[in-house]
């Protein structure tokens, strides 16, 4: 029987390379206090408190997670991104902050600001670094949150990753359907499906 050690709403769960389930973040009930921890299922130890989840609450719900080819875990939350060690979950790399909207750099990509993320396709012989694409989001709701009309890409495993802003080719909107965002978010042909 699998059971969470911390009750949580709005977490992200991901199957790790070893088959375990990583559960990250959330709140204790709808609009409840933050649960700034991560845990593994089946249980292998205590929950681990993450400073970056505490610091960016409440703009880090449903953080974006991906297992990287190098074995690390890419995590994007609010307007920040890191790579975690897949064994002890310490931060092995801090990426530069993601650009937000042109008029408000404080814009974020994770819930409740509501952006989305996908891994970019790789092609044989798979020697190029893995890319990630994050689209949409909004500025914080204080003062009337506005949708972010761009996408950002990076290659997290590069020696010095940088974020590249990709302008959406349609009007600004918060995108919840990644397939649609993927087709419409970039003028760069290599990101367009055939």
Feature annotation, model-predicted:
Residues 56-193:
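Beta-propeller domains
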């Amino acid at each position: 029987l699998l059971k969470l050690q911390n009750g949580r709403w709005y977490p992200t769960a991901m199957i790790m390379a070893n088959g375990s389930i990583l559960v990250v973040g959330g709140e204790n009930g709808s609009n409840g206090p933050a649960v700034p921890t991560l845990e593994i299922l089946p249980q292998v130890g205590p929950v681990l408190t993450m400073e970056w989840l505490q610091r960016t609450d409440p703009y880090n719900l449903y953080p974006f997670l991906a297992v990287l080819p190098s074995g690390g875990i890419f995590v994007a939350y609010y307007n920040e991104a890191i790579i975690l060690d897949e064994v002890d979950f310490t931060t092995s790399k801090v990426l530069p902050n993601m650009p937000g909207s042109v008029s408000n750099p404080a814009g974020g990509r994770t819930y409740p600001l509501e952006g989305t993320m996908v891994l970019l396709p790789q092609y044989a012989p798979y020697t190029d670094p893995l890319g990630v694409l994050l689209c949409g989001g909004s500025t914080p709701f204080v003062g009337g949150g506005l949708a972010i009309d761009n996408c950002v890409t990076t290659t997290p495993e590069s020696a010095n990753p940088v974020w590249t802003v990709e302008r959406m080719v349609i009007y600004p909107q918060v995108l919840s359907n990644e397939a649609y965002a993927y087709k419409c978010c970039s003028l760069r042909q290599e990101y367009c499906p055939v």
